């Protein structure tokens, strides 16, 4: 029996030395130490031995078992280390190979224009205010003197989330929120995305950018409005630009006007950009309607103000010679890399 145990140990040791993977090691473990393994069978036959042999053979069998278990663990670790080394060697990065350049984005003409607009107004003392794009009907319409039966509330112009919530159709609600939260004097612009229920084509988009402004203080007049817009136009389009105002109607301003500037592409001579007219419509503007001031808790007998707004996308398209507004929202790198 003693010789048999020594033979099992030597045989298992030789097999472990030639094992090449975890599968081989597991097969060796089962062969010798499993439920039907050779060493296990000897241990189960201990009862047939004499009382003198049993402790001697039992001790030797346990020593062989412990030795085999230790050798199996040692062989498993060697196999594991070898596999790890092989894997790491296969994953080594050849630093001598040329790298692949990461694809990055590019400056967008809308944001290039918006940054310029914001910087001009900051220099003029305006602060930038922001507000939610999902807006209450109350702020988007009602407090801006747009009653329930106004055509602008129709589904053909407005995206309704429910009866009381819309996707804002203008950034004017930011002006309302500012007047509710701040006391005059107020001098702010509110740039941002707005939404209209328009079918997308070369000149229309259901989403576009607006920049609106508001000034409220004592003694504000239409002359202040004209001076502000003229100053902006000269800084934006050049000192030689000229402006003209045409009477118009907006429910939230009274009096109201639309403002045109001489075409910055042809200097007013007439070209493709201005469609031969020499002028480009830029602003909608006017003096803040007394009802709007009252709705925001501002006494129109004490304070007055003016408001203005322009479509930023239109300026971007005219400035860069873009003839399809959809290009501004497609994120095509071939297009964006031109700017």
From Swiss-Prot:
KW ATP-binding (keyword) present: yes
GO biological process, one term: phenylalanyl-tRNA aminoacylation
Cofactor(s) for this UniProt protein: Mg(2+)
CDD domains from the UniProt entry: PheRS_alpha_core
Localization annotation: Cytoplasm
Cofactor note: Binds 2 magnesium ions per tetramer.
A single MF term (Gene Ontology): ATP binding
Binding site for Mg(2+): 254
Documented EC number(s): 6.1.1.20
Catalysed transformations (reactions): tRNA(Phe) + L-phenylalanine + ATP = L-phenylalanyl-tRNA(Phe) + AMP + diphosphate + H(+)
GO cellular component, one term: cytoplasm
Keyword Metal-binding: yes
InterPro entries: aa-tRNA-synth_II (IPR006195), aa-tRNA-synth_II/BPL/LPL (IPR045864), Phe-tRNA-synth_IIc_asu (IPR004529), Phe-tRNA_ligase_II_N (IPR004188), Phe_tRNA_ligase_alpha1_bac (IPR022911), Phenylalanyl-tRNA_Synthase (IPR002319), tRNA-bd_arm (IPR010978)
EC top class, as a word: ligase
Keywords: Aminoacyl-tRNA synthetase, ATP-binding, Cytoplasm, Ligase, Magnesium, Metal-binding, Nucleotide-binding, Protein biosynthesis
The family this protein is said to belong to: Belongs to the class-II aminoacyl-tRNA synthetase family. Phe-tRNA synthetase alpha subunit type 1 subfamily.
HAMAP family assigned to the protein according to its UniProt record, in alphabetical order: Phe_tRNA_synth_alpha1 (MF_00281)
Description of how the protein assembles with itself and partners: Tetramer of two alpha and two beta subunits.
Identification of the protein by name: Phenylalanine--tRNA ligase alpha subunit
Organism (species): Clostridium acetobutylicum (strain ATCC 824 / DSM 792 / JCM 1419 / IAM 19013 / LMG 5710 / NBRC 13948 / NRRL B-527 / VKM B-1787 / 2291 / W)
Species classification: Bacteria, Bacillati, Bacillota, Clostridia, Eubacteriales
Gene from which the chain derives: pheS
């Amino acid at each position: 029996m003693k010789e048999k145990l020594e033979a099992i140990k030597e045989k298992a040791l030789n097999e472990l030395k030639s094992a090449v993977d975890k599968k081989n090691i597991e097969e060796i473990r089962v062969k010798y130490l499993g439920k039907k393994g050779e060493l296990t069978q000897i241990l189960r036959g201990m009862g047939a031995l004499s009382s003198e042999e049993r402790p001697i053979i039992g001790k030797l069998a346990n020593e062989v078992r412990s030795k085999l278990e230790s050798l199996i663990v040692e062989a498993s670790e060697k196999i594991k280390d070898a596999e790890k080394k092989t894997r790491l060697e296969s994953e080594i990065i050849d630093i001598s190979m040329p790298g692949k350049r990461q694809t990055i984005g590019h400056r967008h003409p809308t944001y290039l224009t918006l940054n310029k607009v914001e910087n001009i107004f900051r220099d003029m003392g305006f602060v930038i205010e922001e507000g939610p794009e999902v807006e209450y009907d109350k702020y988007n319409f009602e407090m801006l003197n747009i009653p329930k039966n106004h055509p602008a509330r129709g589904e053909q112009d407005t995206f309704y989330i429910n009866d009381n919530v819309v996707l804002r159709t203008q950034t004017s609600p930011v002006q309302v929120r500012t007047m509710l939260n701040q006391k005059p004097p107020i001098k702010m612009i509110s740039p941002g995305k707005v939404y209209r229920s328009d079918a997308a084509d070369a000149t229309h988009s259901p989403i576009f950018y607006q920049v609106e402004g508001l000034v409220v203080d004592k003694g504000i007049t239409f002359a202040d409005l004209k001076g502000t817009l003229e100053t902006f136009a000269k800084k934006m389009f050049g000192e030689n630009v000229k402006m003209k105002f045409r009477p118009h109607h907006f429910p939230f301003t009274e009096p109201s006007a639309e403002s045109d500037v001489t075409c910055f592409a042809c200097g007013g001579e007439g070209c493709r950009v201005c469609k031969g007219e020499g002028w480009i419509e830029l602003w909608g503007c006017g003096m803040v309607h007394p009802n709007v001031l009252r709705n925001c808790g501002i006494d129109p007998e004490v304070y007055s103000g003016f408001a203005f707004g322009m479509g930023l996308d239109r300026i971007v398209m005219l400035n860069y010679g873009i003839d399809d507004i959809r290009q501004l929202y497609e994120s095509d790198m071939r297009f964006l890399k031109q700017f």
